[in-house]
C-alpha cells in the first residue's frame, strides 16, 4: 500500500500523506492536527506550538490539501510520464497485489493467491463484492483486460509486463495470436496466469492497478489503444478517492470513494494544490495547504521550525541518476574517450 493512500484511508495515519507527495530528498512539513502522536512515532519532529495553526487550516475540517508540482494530466497508472501524475493515480486506483511498509507483497484487490509447485502458474482470487468507483463490478475479466493492454503492441507506457513471461504474451504482441493464452478467467473472482518460466518479480509485475474493461475497453481491438488514451483525463478507478476535476496550474480535486473496498475514507474531500518553490512556504504558512515538500537547506528548515505548528520530516533521496554513452557516435566508440569522460563525471 502506498504511503499516500494509507494516509488517506485512516485518520490516524493521515500525516503519512506527505511522505508520498515529495519525490525528491528534502523536508516534508504538515500542520499539526489530531492524532499526531501516532505518526510522530515514525520519526517526525513534532510541532513546538500547535496553537499557532492558521485559522484557515483549523476551519477546514472535511478536506486535506497537499502541495504538488503541476502534473501533465495523464491520469492512468500505466501511461503517466512523471511522478506528479503518478501521485494523482495513486489515490484513484488500487493495486491487485500491494506492498506493506517493509516491501513485502500483501493482498490488495486480490484476497489471496497460490503458486504451482514449478512456480509457473499463479491462481489469483479476488475479494468478493469489489466494484469500481461508479459501482460497476470489478472481476477477473478486468484483471485479464488490464494485462492484455500491457501486452498490446501499441502500448507505449513504462510498465514492462514482458518481464513476467506470461505464456502467449509474445505471440499476442507480435500479432501471431488473437488472445493471450496464459490468461485464463476461471470464474468472476478467479484468474489463472501461466508463465513460461519462474520469476521472482512476477507477482509484483502482474499485481498492478486494475482498469475497468467496461470503461477503458469499449471497442478494444489489438493494436489500437486510442480510445483508452482518450480517457486519460477521465479516470475511473477503485482507490480511496474519486477524481472530480483538474484545473491546470491550480489544483486536482477528489471526493471519498464510498465503494472503496477498505471502507469510505474518513476525510470527505482531498485536493492536490499546485505549488512550486516560490509559493509553497507562503501557502503552508497561511494554512492553504496541509502538507508540502521543501528543500533541505538549513535556512528552510529553520524557517519551518519558527512557524511553531509544522511537523517536519527530514529524509534522504531515494533517486538515482545515470549517464549513458551513445556509442553510435564515432567519437564515443573509442573506449579511452568514454573512460576519460567517466572520470570527469
Please annotate each region the language model reported.
Residues 61-70, 111, 121-124, 143-146, ...:
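Short, well-ordered beta-strand elements
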Residues 197-265, 269, 279:
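Gly/Pro-rich hinge or "lid" segments in bacterial periplasmic/extracellular proteins
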Residues 65, 139-148, 188-194, 239-240, ...:
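Alpha-helical secondary-structure segments
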Residues 144, 158-219:
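Surface-exposed binding/hinge segments that line
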Residues 46-52, 65-117, 234-237:
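N-terminal lobe/hinge region of extracytoplasmic solute-binding protein
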Residues 301-314:
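Ligand-binding "clamshell"
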Amino acid at each position: 500500500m502506498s504511503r499516500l493512500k494509507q494516509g488517506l484511508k485512516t485518520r490516524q495515519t493521515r500525516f503519512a500523506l506527505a511522505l508520498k507527495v515529495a519525490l525528491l530528498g528534502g523536508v516534508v512539513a504538515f500542520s499539526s492536527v489530531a492524532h499526531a502522536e501516532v505518526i510522530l512515532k515514525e520519526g517526525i519532529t513534532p510541532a513546538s506550538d500547535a496553537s499557532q495553526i492558521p485559522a484557515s487550516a483549523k476551519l477546514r475540517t472535511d478536506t486535506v490539501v497537499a502541495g504538488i508540482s503541476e502534473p501533465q494530466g495523464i491520469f492512468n497508472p500505466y501511461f503517466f510520464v512523471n511522478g506528479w501524475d503518478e501521485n494523482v493515480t495513486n489515490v484513484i486506483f488500487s493495486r491487485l497485489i500491494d506492498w506493506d511498509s517493509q516491501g513485502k507483497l500483501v493482498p490488495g484487490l486480490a484476497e489471496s493467491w497460490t503458486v504451482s509447485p514449478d512456480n509457473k502458474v499463479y491462481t489469483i482470487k479476488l475479494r468478493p463484492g469489489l466494484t469500481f468507483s461508479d459501482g460497476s463490478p470489478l472481476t477477473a475479466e478486468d484483471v485479464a483486460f488490464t494485462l492484455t493492454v500491457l501486452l498490446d503492441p501499441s502500448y507505449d507506457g513504462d510498465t514492462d509486463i514482458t518481464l513476467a513471461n506470461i505464456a502467449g504474451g509474445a505471440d499476442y504482441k507480435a500479432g501471431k495470436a488473437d488472445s493471450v493464452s496464459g490468461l485464463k478467467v476461471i470464474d468472476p473472482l478467479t484468474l489463472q496466469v501461466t508463465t513460461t518460466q519462474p520469476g521472482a518479480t512476477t507477482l509484483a509485475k502482474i499485481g498492478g492497478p486494475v482498469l475497468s474493461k467496461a470503461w477503458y475497453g469499449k471497442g478494444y481491438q489489438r493494436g489500437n489503444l486510442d480510445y483508452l488514451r482518450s480517457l486519460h483525463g477521465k479516470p475511473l478507478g477503485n482507490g480511496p478517492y474519486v477524481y472530480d476535476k483538474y484545473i491546470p496550474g491550480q489544483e486536482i480535486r477528489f471526493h471519498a470513494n464510498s465503494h472503496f473496498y477498505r471502507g469510505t475514507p474518513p476525510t470527505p474531500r482531498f485536493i492536490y494544490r499546485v505549488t512550486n518553490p516560490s509559493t509553497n512556504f507562503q501557502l503552508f504558512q497561511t494554512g492553504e495547504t496541509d502538507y508540502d515538500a521543501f528543500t533541505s537547506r538549513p535556512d528552510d528548515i529553520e524557517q519551518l521550525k519558527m512557524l511553531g505548528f509544522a511537523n517536519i520530516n527530514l529524509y534522504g533521496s531515494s533517486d538515482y541518476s545515470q549517464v549513458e554513452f551513445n556509442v553510435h557516435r564515432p567519437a564515443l566508440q573509442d573506449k579511452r574517450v568514454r573512460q576519460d569522460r567517466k572520470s570527469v563525471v
